[in-house]
Amino acid sequence: MAKDASLIEANGELKVFIDQNLSPGKGVVSLVAVHPSTVNTLGKQLLPKTFGQSNVNITQQVVIGTPQRPAASNTIVVGSPHTPNTHFVSQNQTSDSSPWSAGKRNRKGEKNGKGLRHFSMKVCEKVQRKGTTSYNEVADELVAEFSAADNHILPNESAYDQKNIRRRVYDALNVLMAMNIISKEKKEIKWIGLPTNSAQECQNLEVERQRRLERIKQKQSQLQELILQQIAFKNLVQRNRQAEQQARRPPPPNSVIHLPFIIVNTSRKTVIDCSISNDKFEYLFNFDNTFEIHDDIEVLKRMGMACGLESGNCSAEDLKVARSLVPKALEPYVTEMAQGSIGGVFVTTTGSTSNGTRLSASDLSNGADGMLATSSNGSQYSGSRVETPVSYVGEDDDDDDDFNENDEED
């Protein structure tokens, strides 16, 4: 048919007609589509022939390549208005399925807040506001927020969006952890803080350094206190054992004070009101004058059981004895304490007037096996484990129902 209409030459080339009525500089190329079966070889380049006057100047000879056409009969060739590429679109597809409409839809979705950047900001805000949270908590809240905003979405699309949101939340949490903005321990997520500049970071590190130095000092003080307690207890045990060997009998029961204990010291003229709970686990003392409280460790120190390490006045012989009472790893600390570097470890406090000092049974109950011979020298100051309770004399408070008055004075 094409040959009959003189559209194809005998050698199979395609004729191209140029409108002779237009100006020479604006040649118009007219392309006539031919059924693929009439063309022998696909991909063969066709050189068009021009018909017209010889004196007409044509700007450029056009070379047309025959594209690969699909085998389906219901397809048409669509040319992009922006690019020279050729796209094959089925006639059964809607116009929204074109690549340009898909790109618009993707950009619109990103603007609606479905991008990783937007999710990262949302996740960061929620973790910062909560302080401590979990992945499920953040993901559930974001799913609820976006589901409420998209009520018109179909159920199957909503399920897909929920999975997408949870995946985005998981990715955002990993990004924030990599940037050290949040920390994760098992299922618990904690807020650390946004990155700061170098000056602020240096200041924060200096504050953290001072805080850790203070903790180290506190730990050193606790260690030295425990070393003194161990030395004092072991010295007391050795002294009691020697006393039993010399007497060849155990001491009388009424001469033994069990550890731990406390001693309350006050004037003979002080009026003391002591109330004891029904279970005898709590004691309430009311004093009308100043008083002092000493614990067992302070009494042992004043008896010389700590070998003078508490004050830094330790002789070479006492140092040797003290080093033998502690493990090998603690011997350097004992030597350091003997040289006087223990200053400031123990707090020396004095008693004061009190009204309503409450003592628990743990301070008065029988504890470690050990016997103590009391010293005749009275103590005026206390360096106990805890600071002395301080209060002032005031009006007498009504006794609680669970206390029984005991008028005995110590």
Curated annotation (Swiss-Prot):
State the Gene3D superfamilies in the record.
Answer: Transcription factor DP (1.20.140.80), Winged helix-like DNA-binding domain superfamily/Winged helix DNA-binding domain (1.10.10.10)
Q: Which CDD domains match?
A: DP_DD
Listed GO MF terms: cis-regulatory region sequence-specific DNA binding; DNA-binding transcription activator activity, RNA polymerase II-specific; DNA-binding transcription factor activity; DNA-binding transcription factor binding; protein domain specific binding; RNA polymerase II transcription regulatory region sequence-specific DNA binding
Task: Output compositional bias ranges, type Acidic residues.
Answer: 394-410
Segments for region (Dimerization): 204-277
- Renumbered to this chain, the Basic residues biased-composition regions fall at 104-114
Give the UniProt keywords, A-Z.
Answer: Acetylation, Activator, Cell cycle, Cytoplasm, DNA-binding, Nucleus, Phosphoprotein, Transcription, Transcription regulation, Ubl conjugation
The residues that make up the annotated DNA-binding region are 113-195
Phosphoserine modifications at: S23
Q: What is its main location?
A: nucleus
Q: Which domain of life is it from?
A: Eukaryota
Instruction: List this protein's GO terms for biological process.
Output: anoikis; epidermis development; negative regulation of fat cell proliferation; positive regulation of DNA-templated transcription; positive regulation of G1/S transition of mitotic cell cycle; positive regulation of transcription by RNA polymerase II; regulation of DNA biosynthetic process; regulation of DNA-templated transcription
Q: Return the Polar residues bias intervals.
A: 79-100, 373-385
Return the annotated region ranges for DCB2: 259-315
Which SMART domains does this chain map to?
A: DP (SM01138), E2F_TDP (SM01372)
Q: Where is this region: DCB1?
A: 214-246
Describe the PTM: Ubiquitinated by the BCR(KBTBD5) complex, leading to its subsequent degradation.
One of the record's GO cellular component terms = transcription regulator complex
Stated role: Can stimulate E2F-dependent transcription. Binds DNA cooperatively with E2F family members through the E2 recognition site, 5'-TTTC[CG]CGC-3', found in the promoter region of a number of genes whose products are involved in cell cycle regulation or in DNA replication. The E2F1:DP complex appears to mediate both cell proliferation and apoptosis. Blocks adipocyte differentiation by repressing CEBPA binding to its target gene promoters.
Name of the protein in question: Transcription factor Dp-1
